[in-house]
């Protein structure tokens, strides 16, 4: 119990102490991206490019058909959450491409 005032009575009575914060459990890190995994995925993306369904989804996103793109990706990857993550990833790629094109001009 971290105390605000060293008082003898009340909710905050007792000695002033600092809370002992423990490390998070190892099981909590599932799904986190490590530096190595990110590097490998980026390398593969650079070499292989995008899958045909990803290219089509990016075309849909270019013409502001976000909902249609989500439905299309969901059909391909299986679940709604994975589809949302993939759509977000592809829209970030498009934004980066637009930014690079604007910087080049």
Curated annotation (Swiss-Prot):
GO molecular function, one term: structural constituent of ribosome
GO CC terms of this entry: cytosolic large ribosomal subunit
InterPro entries: Ribosomal_eL36, Ribosomal_eL36_sf
GO biological process: cytoplasmic translation
Assigned keywords, A-Z: Acetylation, Cytoplasm, Ribonucleoprotein, Ribosomal protein
Main location: cytoplasm
One Pfam family hit: Ribosomal_L36e
Record-listed N6-acetyllysine modification sites: 62
Taxonomic superkingdom: Eukaryota
Subcellular location(s) per record: Cytoplasm, Cytosol; Cytoplasm
Subunit and partners: Component of the large ribosomal subunit.
Family: Belongs to the eukaryotic ribosomal protein eL36 family.
Functional description taken from the UniProt entry: Component of the large ribosomal subunit. The ribosome is a large ribonucleoprotein complex responsible for the synthesis of proteins in the cell.
Designated name of the protein: Large ribosomal subunit protein eL36
Species name: Bos taurus (Bovine)
The gene coding this protein: RPL36
